[in-house]
């Protein structure tokens, strides 16, 4: 992987990730394909929304179908027939979200398989091996996603262990002869001094890109903005920056303003299945009765298949009847909305008009522009 940085506007960056499998224009949003599929979508439909890279879930694909089934097909690209690049998370977030059924040790994490209850162990080395078999174009290190809230002492211990695991991840990744990209993950909760230590330690180890982890886990939005403003300038400018698990459209806008290049989140697909649809002027809850006889498109400014062909009334009808097509059409629209938003941000950065874009984005939604505390 090669990262090319074209231009900046304030702290926002316009560039691209270049892989053997294709080019990803940045800032980029990655749809989430947890089980080897973006829920309800064919790879061709996902590509048609404008997505150039997707995310796969190491933890879930390890449990089902497993490494051996994956290797029978070649890798995850062959298994799911996605032709572009794939980023896989390390499995750390899913393991730590298991709560009481897992035990963290210096060696790794012991837990119960949530499917059948069998005891399982996952460590940095195993995570690197699974992601190698998946053929991931971007591999994420195995870390502990520090929960929120966490006091300073716990966050410090968690961050320090994640640094040790980062070195183990790097060593095993290199030992496998993996020629793809490996990203480090910056931890430290909401504490700037801990984030400083994490960034410094990861840069000393050396990675192809750097993710900001442990945000969007319940902390106030102001804390997320503060940490991004503090951390992003410390990440080497020639490496991509990835904000994990984020988020709402406004979170993408604010991340870009602070220098983030990559995002992922289940929100557009999960919300689509619940009839919660993103449009230029805000949000449409399609199951509300007021849409029952509305013959207008979901978003007159959207060029997606759904908006070009169907009315709000039809989408309302499908949702109320729990028809599968409704969830699919909603997903197509929400994914396209996110890709249109990212394209708009990229164009605004190219033209040096990002803050004008941001102002209009919030005006259309009837909300104030959040403060940006950067030099």
From Swiss-Prot:
Keywords assigned by UniProt, alphabetized: Glycosyltransferase, Metal-binding, Queuosine biosynthesis, Transferase, tRNA processing, Zinc
EC numbers: 2.4.2.29
Catalytic activity: 7-aminomethyl-7-carbaguanine + guanosine(34) in tRNA = 7-aminomethyl-7-carbaguanosine(34) in tRNA + guanine
GO biological process: queuosine biosynthetic process; tRNA wobble guanine modification; tRNA-guanine transglycosylation
Residues that, per the record, bind substrate: 89-93, 143, 187, 214
Pfam families attached to this UniProt entry: TGT (PF01702)
GO molecular function annotation: metal ion binding; tRNA-guanosine(34) queuine transglycosylase activity
Subunit structure: Homodimer. Within each dimer, one monomer is responsible for RNA recognition and catalysis, while the other monomer binds to the replacement base PreQ1.
Binding positions for Zn(2+) per the UniProt entry: 302, 304, 307, 333
Pathway: tRNA modification; tRNA-queuosine biosynthesis
Protein name: Queuine tRNA-ribosyltransferase
Any coiled-coil regions, as ranges: none
Entry function: Catalyzes the base-exchange of a guanine (G) residue with the queuine precursor 7-aminomethyl-7-deazaguanine (PreQ1) at position 34 (anticodon wobble position) in tRNAs with GU(N) anticodons (tRNA-Asp, -Asn, -His and -Tyr). Catalysis occurs through a double-displacement mechanism. The nucleophile active site attacks the C1' of nucleotide 34 to detach the guanine base from the RNA, forming a covalent enzyme-RNA intermediate. The proton acceptor active site deprotonates the incoming PreQ1, allowing a nucleophilic attack on the C1' of the ribose to form the product.
PANTHER family per record: QUEUINE TRNA-RIBOSYLTRANSFERASE
Cofactor(s) the protein needs: Zn(2+)
Active site location: 89 (proton acceptor), 264 (nucleophile)
UniProt enzyme class: transferase
Region (RNA binding): 245-251, 269-273
Gene3D superfamilies per UniProt: Queuine tRNA-ribosyltransferase-like (3.20.20.105)
Co-factor remark: Binds 1 zinc ion per subunit.
TM spans (from-to): none
InterPro entries membership: ArchSynthase1/Queuine_TRR, TGT, TGT-like_sf, tRNA_ribo_trans-like
Gene it is expressed from: tgt
Family from the record: Belongs to the queuine tRNA-ribosyltransferase family.
GO cellular component, one term: cytosol
């Amino acid at each position: 992987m090669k990262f090319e940085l074209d231009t900046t506007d304030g702290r926002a960056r316009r560039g691209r990730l270049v892989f053997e499998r294709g080019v990803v224009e940045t800032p980029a949003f990655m749809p989430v394909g947890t089980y080897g599929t973006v829920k309800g979508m064919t790879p061709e439909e996902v590509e048609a929304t404008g997505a150039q890279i997707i995310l796969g879930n190491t933890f879930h694909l390890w449990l089902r179908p497993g490494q051996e089934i994956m290797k029978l097909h070649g890798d995850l690209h062959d298994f799911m027939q996605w032709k572009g690049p794939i980023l896989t998370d390390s499995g750390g977030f899913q393991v730590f979200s298991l709560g009481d059924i897992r035990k963290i040790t210096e060696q790794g994490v012991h837990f119960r398989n949530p499917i059948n209850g069998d005891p399982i162990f996952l460590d940095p080395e195993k995570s690197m091996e699974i992601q190698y078999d998946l053929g991931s174009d971007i591999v994420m290190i195995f870390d502990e996603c520090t929960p929120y809230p966490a006091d300073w002492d716990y966050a410090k211990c968690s961050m320090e262990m994640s640094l040790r695991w980062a070195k183990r991840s790097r060593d095993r990744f290199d030992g496998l002869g993996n020629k793809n990209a490996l990203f480090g993950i910056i931890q430290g909760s909401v504490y700037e001094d801990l984030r400083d230590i994490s960034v410094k330690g990861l840069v000393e180890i050396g990675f192809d890109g750097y993710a900001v982890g442990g945000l969007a886990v319940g902390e106030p939005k102001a804390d997320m903005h503060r940490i991004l403003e503090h951390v992003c300038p410390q990440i080497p400018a020639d490496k991509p920056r990835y904000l994990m698990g984020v988020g709402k459209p406004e979170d993408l806008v604010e991340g870009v303003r602070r220098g983030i290049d990559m995002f992922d989140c289940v929100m557009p697909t999960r919300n689509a299945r619940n009839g919660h649809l993103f449009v230029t002027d805000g949000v449409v809850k399609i199951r509300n009765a007021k849409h029952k006889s509305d013959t207008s498109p979901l978003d007159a400014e959207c060029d997606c298949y759904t908006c070009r062909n169907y009315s709000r009334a039809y989408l309302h009808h499908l949702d109320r009847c729990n028809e599968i097509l409704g969830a699919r059409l909603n997903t197509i629209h929400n994914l396209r909305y996110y890709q249109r938003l990212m394209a708009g941000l990229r164009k605004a950065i190219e033209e040096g008009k990002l803050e004008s874009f941001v102002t209009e984005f919030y005006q259309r939604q009837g909300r104030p522009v959040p403060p940006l505390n950067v030099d």
